[in-house]
Every structure is written in C-alpha cells, then in structure tokens.
A protein has these predicted regions:
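Canonical Rossmann dinucleotide-binding motif of NAD(H)/NADP(H)-dependent dehydrogenases/reductases
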Residues: 1-29
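Conserved glycine-rich Rossmann-like NAD(P)H-binding loop of the short-chain dehydrogenase/reductase
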Residues: 24-40
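The beta1-alpha1 cofactor-binding region of Rossmann-like NAD(H)/NADP(H)-dependent oxidoreductases
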Residues: 50-62, 95
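C-terminal helical subdomain
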Residues: 161-165, 172, 176-177, 181-184, ...
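A glycine-rich helix->loop->beta "capping" turn
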Residues: 66-79, 85-86
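Hydrophobic positions on the long internal alpha-helix
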Residues: 78, 112-116, 120, 166-167
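Catalytic loop of short-chain dehydrogenase/reductase
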Residues: 83, 87-102, 121-172
C-alpha cells in the first residue's frame, strides 16, 4: 500500500487531495499544526494523523520519527501547507512580512523535505509533490487574459516562484526521488475567500501525479490542464 503524507491537509485542497487518495487505496497521513482539527479530519477520512508544524524544526523532526516508527518508509510527500500572509503592495512590503510568508511556503517546504528524505529513500518509487501557484509564474502574471495578472501579491507570488525553482533543483540533484510541482489554480477555499473553482478541480493535478506510480515523471510543473508556463 502506498504511504502518503500531506502537510496542511485538515481542510481545503489538502483535505480533498487526502480524501481522493484514501479513496484510491493509499494510506494517507494528514499532517496539521492544529491537533484537534487534524485528528477530526483524519477520522472523517479514515486516514492517519500526525501533528506537524512546518515552521518548527522539532515538530517536523517528531513527525518524521512518528512515520519512521509506524510506517517505516514514505512513498509520497505532498508539501501542501501554505499561507497567503498579509497582503501589501510592493512599495509598502516589509522584510518581516516577506519572511513570515516564506517561513511557511518556502523554508517549511525545505524543512519537511529534508526531514523526510531518508524515509522517502526507503520507498521503491519515492515522490515529492510541491504545491505551487500560477501567481509565481512570470508568464501568467504578465498576461492580461489570465486571472493571475489581476492580483499584486508580491510576497506570496514570489514565494511560489521559489517553490517552483526548488522543485526543479531538487529534481536535478536527487534523481532517485521524483520531484514535481502542481498548481491547483484559483480554488474556492477559505484561503481565497471562496472565489474560484471547486476543491475537486483544485486537487486534480496533485491527485494525478500521486497516482502515477512507476510512471511518475520528475521536474515537471503542471496544473490540471497540463504544463504550467514558467
């Protein structure tokens, strides 16, 4: 059975991704900072729960030890946890605001990936799926026909540009693990103020990559329609 960990999966796109992968027969671990809500989400889905705050070294290390003891390996890691943070125009943006967003969206991804890499390498076909965004695409944010061009989210967007580049660099440096990035698109969750398509569509790209098995590629950046322009 495929063992999968999804960070930030107690609600929204992460929760829907977990639901679909449980339905597909995977053993899914829901990683969440909020233990109460995380356990409730896991119980509803028939998944496992591990408390995991991606901004805290000790929390991430403890979560990795829990999976090592109870699962022995990790087939798929989905770095889904992310925050929008305080929205500020570039001319009013401070280093502190940027650092706060990067701590979860970028440093958290690196922290979790580093901690779980030994468990991934213990799997037959290990895979890491990083949730990025079209708001981090140079092409899309400059295309007036795209919704991404309408949101001046410099801090969040640049954090997702970093996620995309990290994915590509991981893929180049670690050929024994598949690394791919997926863009859910504008999805109607608490994160977006309920604007956009449904979570079913938002989870589609991650679910597709997570169910490819031995055919999983590496170094790709996609949304549910195909290759995401960089």
């Amino acid at each position: 059975m495929t063992t999968t960990l999804i960070t930030g999966a107690n609600r929204g796109i992460g929760y829907e991704t977990a639901r679909r992968l449980v339905e597909a027969g995977q053993r899914v671990w829901i990683g969440a900072r909020d233990a109460e809500n995380g356990r409730k989400a896991a119980d509803r889905l028939g998944a496992d729960f591990v408390q995991l705050d991606v901004t805290d070294d000790a929390s991430v290390d403890a979560a990795a030890e829990t999976l090592r003891a109870r699962a022995g390996h990790l087939d798929i890691l989905i770095n889904n946890a992310g925050i929008l943070g305080e929205v500020a125009a570039p001319d009013n943006m401070t280093a502190g605001q940027l650092r706060h967003i990067y701590e979860t969206n970028v440093f958290g991804l690196v922290r979790v990936t580093h901690a779980f890499l030994p468990l991934l390498r213990a799997a037959a076909v290990p895979s890491v799926i990083n949730v990025t965004s079209g708001l981090g695409s140079f092409t899309l944010v400059q295309d007036p026909e795209r919704v991404e061009s309408q949101y001046p989210l410099a801090a969040y967007g640049s954090s997702k540009s970093a996620v995309t580049m990290l994915t590509v660099q991981y893929a180049k440096a670690i050929p024994d693990v598949r690394f791919n990035a997926v863009d859910p698109g504008q999805t109607a969750t608490e994160f977006t103020g309920r604007i956009g398509h449904g979570v079913e569509e938002g989870a589609e790209a991650a679910v597709r990559i997570a169910t490819l098995g031995p055919d999983t590629p590496t170094g790709t950046v996609t949304d549910r329609s195909g290759v995401l322009p960089w």
